[in-house]
Amino acid sequence: MNRTLRRWCLSGLISLTLFAPVPAVYAASIEAGFSPEGSALQLVLNTIVTAQQSIRLMGYSFTSPEVTRALIQAKQRGIDVRVLLDWKTNSAKGSAGVAAMNLLANAGIPVRTVSQFKIMHDKVIITDGRNVETGSFNYSRAAANSNSENALVIRDYPALADTYLKHWQSRWEMGRDWSVSY
């Protein structure tokens, strides 16, 4: 009887193992791009365009018309977009940074600036709580066309994205809402 009981238990365990639901496992992928060759900007834009739920951007210099346009289009697609930028680099009256922030704010995208640090030098985009774009690439024309820069996208790595989201949130809480100025 003991032997029969063991067989039944073993059969039951094997059945449970074979037919138990398997959690989805994602294999992270990594892609690098460089400028001024153009692949860094394309990676940044692709990160924004492929977002399905949320985009959290934090940046130092923000003057890129292409990135500004892509973020506005994402907002128009229903994506939850929020942008956090260094105050000193982007707030000079009449600057391209002010123009870009005004465009975002007028499109209904919450924009905040941070001034508590000598510079807020982060350059990162987190999308859908699982993808991270980071590197030296500023979201600017100079980064795309003149500077030697790099961008790295790590896709399908929720634990890494969560680490970056916590950092982003800590800076967001320090930030001040951008008021549109003309």
Feature-to-residue mapping (PLM):
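Extracytoplasmic/secreted cell-surface and envelope-processing proteins
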Residues: 64-69, 90-99, 120-123, 134-135, ...
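Sec/Tat signal peptide C-region and signal peptidase I cleavage site
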Residues: 22-27
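Primarily the HKD phosphodiesterase
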Residues: 46-109
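N-terminal secretory signal peptides that target proteins for export/translocation
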Residues: 1-4
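Signature of lipid phosphatidyltransferase scaffolds
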Residues: 42, 120, 127, 131-182
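Bacterial N-terminal signal peptides
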Residues: 9-21
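A mature extracytoplasmic/lumenal domain signature
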Residues: 36, 59-63, 85-89, 115, ...
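Structural recognition of the beta-strand scaffold that forms the well-ordered cores
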Residues: 31, 56-59, 82-85, 112-113, ...
